[in-house]
């Protein structure tokens, strides 16, 4: 059996208090603050506690030149090697590690900056249900947060408290201001209405549709859309989750931005889509009546083709999605539709539904849009105290 270390690995000395049943049973406080070494690897789902002996073995075993199992046992001991094989920090050529080797190969093939790869891989949510937590009283209200943590930092941030300010001229008021004033996050969608084919097509093209291309070199094409993107690569994909849309069956569709067309991936019943969409937005039940959601994913292999192991590239992913989200909001406001964006998503459920390969393509955020209810039943930012600039 041939063995090698995983491609990327980082360790942390963790001394955060954690629940310890042994402490509780022995009359202690139930917390353990003993420092422990935790190993993080992007091909794994969670950090692994390791001993100093296991760290020594990981230091000495190559990630590129496999070694014989028996040779490593003689050098580091059977218990150490088997423990590292069992937790996936060491990879072998047997069938039991096929999936882990495939994930590790993606880490090799896609030029991730290691800290970003670990943050992306291990920051993913699984089976989070915010609605259920609300029902059980596990979510803190604003008042409870103030009581527990003190007042939030003030919304106006000044660097010099007593310095004189420089007055600016009154801003122009054009037709664009009216659209901006209508931009808001909607939590009240009308479950009896569908989104029209025209509105859906307009939203998809305005936000994610390609306007033109420019060949920078053979094999390197930049894309122009209505929002900016790092390097002109536009590595964000749009997957449309349809619950109620004119002319479309409920299901999952991939938007082909260069063709302005939908690629059907899976067809479901309306109830199945409602349940899937609820899981995808982590149980935020105030969004479940929206007729369509769009999952925005990042194609890391495309973006990192240019920005290889770049310390800033992962930030660009989130900037791109932010630009698209604002374009979505403004387009929805123009069409008189409600809209939202959320990054509180169950990554695992999305990856399974869309068939994504972790770290090659990953979900970043979900947006949704459609007809609003005439009267709010869930809190939105209405009744604002408007600022007077006169």
How would you name each of these model-derived features?
Residues 1-284, 293, 353, 362-364, ...:
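N-terminal accessory segments that position/regulate proteins before the catalytic core
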Residues 85, 288, 333:
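Anion (oxyanion) recognition and catalysis
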Residues 195, 282, 286, 312-320:
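Short alpha-helix boundary/capping segments
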Residues 203, 238, 294, 313-350:
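Small-aliphatic-rich amphipathic alpha-helix that forms the alpha element of a beta-alpha
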Residues 274-275, 308-315:
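Short, surface-exposed loop/helix-turn segments at secondary-structure junctions
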Residues 285-290, 295-311:
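Active-site-adjacent "gating/activation" loops or surface patches in catalytic cores
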Residues 299-303, 346-348, 372-374:
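Short Gly/Pro-enriched loop/turn and capping motifs at secondary-structure junctions
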Residues 326, 340-343, 358-362, 367:
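C-terminal structured interaction module
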């Amino acid at each position: 059996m041939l063995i090698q270390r995983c491609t990327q690995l980082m360790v942390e000395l963790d001394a955060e208090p954690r629940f310890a049943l042994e402490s509780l049973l022995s009359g202690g406080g139930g917390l353990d603050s003993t420092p422990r070494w935790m190993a993080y690897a992007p091909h794994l789902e969670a950090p692994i506690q390791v001993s100093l002996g296991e760290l020594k073995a990981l230091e000495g075993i190559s990630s590129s030149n496999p070694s014989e199992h028996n040779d490593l046992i003689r050098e580091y001991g059977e218990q150490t090697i088997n423990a590292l094989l069992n937790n996936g920090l060491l990879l072998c050529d047997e069938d039991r590690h096929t999936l882990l080797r495939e994930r590790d190969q993606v880490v090799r093939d896609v030029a991730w900056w290691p800290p970003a790869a670990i943050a992306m891989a291990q920051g993913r949510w699984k089976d989070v249900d915010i609605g259920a937590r609300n029902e059980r009283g596990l979510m803190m209200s604003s008042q409870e947060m103030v009581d527990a943590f003190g007042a939030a930092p003030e919304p106006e941030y000044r660097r010099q408290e007593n310095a004189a300010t420089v007055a600016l001229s009154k801003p122009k008021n054009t037709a664009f201001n009216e659209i901006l004033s209508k931009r808001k996050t909607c939590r009240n969608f009308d479950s009896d209405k569908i989104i029209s084919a025209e509105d859906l097509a307009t939203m998809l093209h305005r936000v994610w549709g390609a306007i033109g291309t420019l060949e920078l070199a053979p094999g390197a094409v930049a894309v122009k859309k209505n929002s900016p993107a790092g390097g002109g690569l536009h590595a964000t994909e749009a997957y449309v989750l349809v619950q109620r849309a004119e002319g479309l069956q409920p299901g999952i569709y991939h938007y082909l931005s260069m063709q302005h067309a939908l690629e059907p991936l899976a067809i479901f019943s309306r109830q199945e889509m409602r349940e899937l969409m609820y899981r995808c937005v982590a149980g935020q039940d105030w969004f479940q009546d929206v007729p369509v959601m769009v999952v925005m994913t990042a194609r890391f292999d495309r973006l990192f083709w240019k920005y290889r192991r770049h310390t800033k590239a992962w930030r660009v992913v989130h900037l791109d999605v932010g630009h698209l989200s604002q374009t979505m909001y403004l387009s929805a406001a123009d069409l008189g539709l409600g809209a939202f964006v959320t990054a509180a998503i169950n990554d695992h459920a999305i990856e399974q539904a869309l068939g994504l390969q972790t770290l090659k393509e990953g979900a970043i955020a979900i947006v949704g849009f459609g007809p609003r209810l005439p009267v709010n039943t869930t809190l939105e930012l209405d009744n604002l105290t408007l600022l007077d600039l006169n």
